[in-house]
Amino acid sequence: MENLEAKILEADSLEVLEKVRIELFGKKGLLAAQFAKMKDIPGPEKKAFAEGLNKQKTALQEAFDARYEVLKAEEIEKMLKSEAIDISLYGAVAEKGALHPVMETMDKIIDYFVALNFAVETGPMVEDDFHNFEALNLPKYHPARDMQDTFYFKDSGLLRTHTSPVQIRTMLETKPPIRMIAPGSVFRRDYDLTHTPMFHQVEGLVVDEKGKVSFANLKAILTDFLQYMFGDVEVRFRPSFFPFTEPSAEVDISCIFCEGKGCRVCSHTGWLEVLGCGIVDPNVFKAVGYEDVSGYAFGLGVERFAMLMHKIPDLRSLFEGDIRLLEQFR
């Protein structure tokens, strides 16, 4: 018995212990051979022999189980040590993303007007002639339509050339007073250093009872907005023409590159054109069924603002997905 237990305790691996198990407990093992002898033992002695053999088997099984647990634990410990990971080592650090400079600029513009209680309105990019042109005082064959090279679909419809149709849809669905901006993508057939076929605009509209909205209000809010975007710049309004506003104006800021002294960027004028605005033409209000109201509207190109804020010379580079350029704006 002691020799058999010693065999179990001397096993130094699970493989060796398995061989001992087969030798002791297998069908042809030592214990099986002892139980086979019972048939030759006389009746009176058989009971005592069986009891002694069962006790021996139980003791050996307990010794085997205990040794198995010890060896199993040692094997697991060895495996864990061999597969250990030094958690103090730095892993692969994922680079953080960032907003595209156009979207960052768009968000900054929207934040300004939302703080002044302007609603943010959206509309479809595929428009019809009425919302994109006719309701904005651009009837068929109006020469001003040539100012915007339009993408037309074969059957009907077009890609909107500005976000002004959102203003028309809002006025058709809402009664005055209205304070809204319409940010979004617009499309024109143009591609050069300062134009792309798809770009982004933010247009604004304020409508109220006649006499409550004036050009002075428009100048005040746009001057404050431009100084919010570009810092302490001078702002000037120049007479201009837009079919949907009368009077109309182009808005310039003193050149942020030369501080108004004159440079190549501002064509040595000291000024940079940034947006257009004006008092809403009565024909626009007539198209949406408004009476006895007045209002002002303005519109700006987000890419133009992004180029000025980040001093980007070529508009097209904003849409080429060049990581070397974009990672500079994190």
UniProtKB/Swiss-Prot annotation:
Species the sequence originates in: Sulfurovum sp. (strain NBC37-1)
**What is this protein called in UniProt?**
Phenylalanine--tRNA ligase alpha subunit
Compartments annotated for it: namely: Cytoplasm
Cofactors that this protein relies on: Mg(2+)
| Catalysis performed (reactions) | tRNA(Phe) + L-phenylalanine + ATP = L-phenylalanyl-tRNA(Phe) + AMP + diphosphate + H(+)
Top-level taxon of the source organism: Bacteria
The answer to whether keyword Transmembrane applies is no
What residue stretch is flagged as signal peptide? none
Assembly and binders: Tetramer of two alpha and two beta subunits.
Query: Which EC number(s) are documented for this chain?
Result: 6.1.1.20
Q: Which residues cross the membrane?
A: none
Record keywords, A-Z: Aminoacyl-tRNA synthetase, ATP-binding, Cytoplasm, Ligase, Magnesium, Metal-binding, Nucleotide-binding, Protein biosynthesis
Main subcellular location of this protein, as a coarse class: cytoplasm
GO molecular function terms here?
ATP binding; magnesium ion binding; phenylalanine-tRNA ligase activity; tRNA binding
Q: What family does the database annotate?
A: Belongs to the class-II aminoacyl-tRNA synthetase family. Phe-tRNA synthetase alpha subunit type 1 subfamily.
* Cofactor info, note text: Binds 2 magnesium ions per tetramer.
